[in-house]
Amino acid sequence: MKFELDTTQGRARRGRLVFERGTVETPAFMPVGTYGTVKGMTPEEVRATGADILLGNTFHLWLRPGEEIMRKHGDLHDFMNWQRPILTDSGGFQVFSLGDIRKITEEGVHFRSPINGEKIFLDPEKSMQIQNSLGSDVVMIFDECTPYPATEDEARKSMQMSLRWAQRSRDEFDKLENPNSLFGIIQGGVYEDLRDESLKGLVDIGFDGYAVGGLAVGEPKADMHRILEHTCPQIPTDKPRYLMGVGKPEDLVEGVRRGVDMFDCVMPTRNARNGHLFTTEGVIKIRNARHRDDTSPLDDKCDCYTCKNYSRAYLYHLDRCNEILGARLNTIHNLRYYQKLMEGLRGAIETGTLDAFVEEFYTSQGREVPEVPELTD
């Protein structure tokens, strides 16, 4: 992987990630394909929304279908028929989410399979081996997602163990002679000094990119912004910056303003299945009876397949009848909305009009533009 940085406006960055399997324009949003599929979508449909790269879930693909079946197909690209870049998470966050059915030690994590209750052990070495089998273009280190709330001492111990796991991940990745890219994950909770220590340790080890982890786990939005404002400028300029698991459209806008290059989140697809649809004027709840006889499209500024062909009334009807097509059309729209937002952000950075773009983004929804500190490096 090669990261090319074209231009900046404030801290916002316009560039691209160049892989053998294709180029990813940044800032970029990655749809989530947890089980080797973006729910309800074919790869061709996902690509048509403007997606250049997908996120796969190491933990779930390891449990089902497993490495052996994956290898029989070649790798995850062949298994799901997506011949473009794929980033896989390490499984650390999913283990974190298991709560009481897992036990974290220095060696790794012991837990019971959420599928059949089988006892399973996952450590940095195994995570690297699984992601190698998946053929991931971007491999994430195995780390512990620091919970919120956590005391500074708790966050320090978690972060320092994640640093030791980062070294083990790097060593195993190199041992496997994996030709792809490995990203480090900055931890430290809401404590700036711990974020500094984490980043320094990761840079000393050396990675192809750096993710900001452990955010969007329940902390106030102001804390997330503060950590991004503090941490992003310290990440090496020539490396991509990835904010994991984020988020709402406004979170992407605010992340880009603070120097983030990559995002992923289940929100556009999950919300689509629940009838919550993103538009330039705000969120539409298609289950609301007000849409029952509305012949207008979801968003007259959207160029997606759904908006060009179907009315709000039809989408309301599909939802009321629990038709699968409704969830699919909603997903197409939400994913296109996210990709169009990223296209707009990229174009605004290129032309030096980011401030005007951000103002239009908020005012078109009847919202005030959030103030941002003077973001100069």
Curated annotation (Swiss-Prot):
Protein source organism: Shewanella sediminis (strain HAW-EB3)
Pathway recorded for this protein: tRNA modification; tRNA-queuosine biosynthesis
Enzyme Commission numbers on file: 2.4.2.29
Cofactor binding: number and manner: Binds 1 zinc ion per subunit.
Chain spans, region RNA binding: 245-251, 269-273
Record's GO cellular component terms: cytosol
Pfam families: TGT
Taxon lineage: Bacteria, Pseudomonadati, Pseudomonadota, Gammaproteobacteria, Alteromonadales
PANTHER family in the cross-refs: QUEUINE TRNA-RIBOSYLTRANSFERASE (PTHR46499:SF1)
Binding site for substrate: D89, S90, G91, G92, F93, D143, Q187, G214
Assigned keywords, A-Z: Glycosyltransferase, Metal-binding, Queuosine biosynthesis, Transferase, tRNA processing, Zinc
Gene for this chain: tgt
Identification of the protein by name: Queuine tRNA-ribosyltransferase
Similarity comment text for this entry: Belongs to the queuine tRNA-ribosyltransferase family.
The keyword Hydrolase is assigned to this record: no
Function: Catalyzes the base-exchange of a guanine (G) residue with the queuine precursor 7-aminomethyl-7-deazaguanine (PreQ1) at position 34 (anticodon wobble position) in tRNAs with GU(N) anticodons (tRNA-Asp, -Asn, -His and -Tyr). Catalysis occurs through a double-displacement mechanism. The nucleophile active site attacks the C1' of nucleotide 34 to detach the guanine base from the RNA, forming a covalent enzyme-RNA intermediate. The proton acceptor active site deprotonates the incoming PreQ1, allowing a nucleophilic attack on the C1' of the ribose to form the product.
Catalyses which reaction(s): 7-aminomethyl-7-carbaguanine + guanosine(34) in tRNA = 7-aminomethyl-7-carbaguanosine(34) in tRNA + guanine
Coiled-coil regions listed: none
